[in-house]
Amino acid sequence: MLFLCLSTVFFIPSLSAEEPSEPIPLHILAVNDFHGQISPGQKINGTPVGSIPVLGAYLSNATETYGVNNTIIALPGDLTGASPAESNLLLDEPAILFFNRFVTGDWKKTDSTQSGGRVIATLGNHEFDRNVSELLRLINGGNGDTNITHLVDPYPGALWPVIAANVYWNGTENLVFAPYVIEHVNGIPVAFIGAVTQVTSEISEPEKVASVVFTDEADAINAQVQALQKEGIHAFVVLLHEGGTQTPYDGPTRETGDLSGRVASIVIRLDEDVDVVLSGHTHAFTNQFLPNAGGKPTLVTQAYSYSSAYADVSLALDTQSRDVVNSSATIITTYADQGPGQIPDTNAQELLDAVNTTVAPFTSQVIATTDIPLTRTPDENGEALLYNIVTDAFRWYMKTDMSILNIGSLRADIDAGEITTGEAYSVMPFHDQINIVQMTGQQILDLLNQQWTRTVKPDHLLQISGFTYSYDESREPQDRVIHITFEGKDLDMNKKYTVATTDFLISGGDGYTVMKEGDVIAYGALDVDEFIEYLKSIPSPIHQKTGGRIIRVGNQSEDAMTAG
């Protein structure tokens, strides 16, 4: 008996001394705010980026490098909506078909292959641009209400899970979508939970989202985490369509950073088991660890927008605890002339060619003509011709007193000659919603002065319609506007005026925080739709000129100003 006991004592340390298994790698390729940007045209520092042939090459190369069984493509919202013409006219189906290609191997196929990859998506606010029923069709499949030839007939829908833990049918406790999906990586379960920004109902047209309710993101995520913890799951990745801003840098995640914005206030409330938050919505760079509710570091990423980049997230999964024991990320820009971008994805190129052939008869429709180029270049006063026409369009369509738009909203000039629907979409690829905000004369004055006090692009002036103003750059930045005229009279500082502008500006975009002081009183259509309708309504050819709306003192007499 003594020998047996000694033998037992001898063998126990031997078992405990075995080398632990190596952690299992999981690589997540996160593409946020794609917005149907299937075509080339985007540039960073003058270098072409994005498009599905280029993005497809990057994602395919990364998947091949890491291994299909250890790679997941994640889409943290706004995959569709606010899309260019070629996507928009096809009801955003090309974006879905492109990512189906990573599951099926071919965008035309409608069933997954045994060796197919994995894709997971959550929703963004722009997924609700048309309405909830159309969103469900886009996800679940079935031909949409369009007379354009279908690329795949019948349209198959998304061949991958779409998750959202905080979207409920109005008046019920029923979720519209599955809140999470469990993916197994070498036998280790990893939970992916989705959530869309709670303010979706505030930044969408009310009738489009009347049937659903968006609840608090952190509460919804935590509820799912706690339920799944009871099932023994401890590795959690969140797809969150909400974001912030951070100073960009190259390379892997750094220990410190300056991330700010609404995403930070959400992460700090998340359960300590949440390992990664793949964010979106703000079209910005994010790559930082933030403390969660338990004080543990949560990796937070975001990779710009419009197919120009993706977040390459590397996780290490412990085989014993089945938890994430290491995490890091790098934001990869999808340069077309570098790395994988030099050999475009042939299957994605085939899809893009099919799209362009299909929509050509529609994008080539002539809506107006112009005798002169309509450019975005400001004159000596800071006034730009194309912006004058666009702000006139918004004021006309929304029937407001004024219209205000930030430089940078328009992304292409229009050459002399015929103006097509395709060109209109090129001018306005962001597809901002135009709303009416009510502001006092004092708030309008403060907003105009903020052009020189904000830290974002202080040399870019706002573009206007419906009023005139003069400014003097020799005065203090906060007091440069010296005169505002509306309908031939001085602007009344106490009176309220209606202003047509973008949802981007209303939210304080480009540093115009004064805009947030106004009251949104009505919601309109997308900018490009209003622009097209306006061009159809005015005489052609267009021969409008700049002058008289914005006057820099020293260039012209202020008396020369006329209402625009």
Question: How would you describe each model-predicted region?
Answer:
Residues 1-3:
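Classical eukaryotic N-terminal signal peptides for Sec-dependent ER targeting/secretion
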Residues 7-21:
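N-terminal signal peptide
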Residues 17-31, 35, 43, 47-52, ...:
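Non-catalytic terminal accessory segments
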Residues 18-335, 381-393, 453-456, 460, ...:
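Acidic, metal/ion-coordinating pockets
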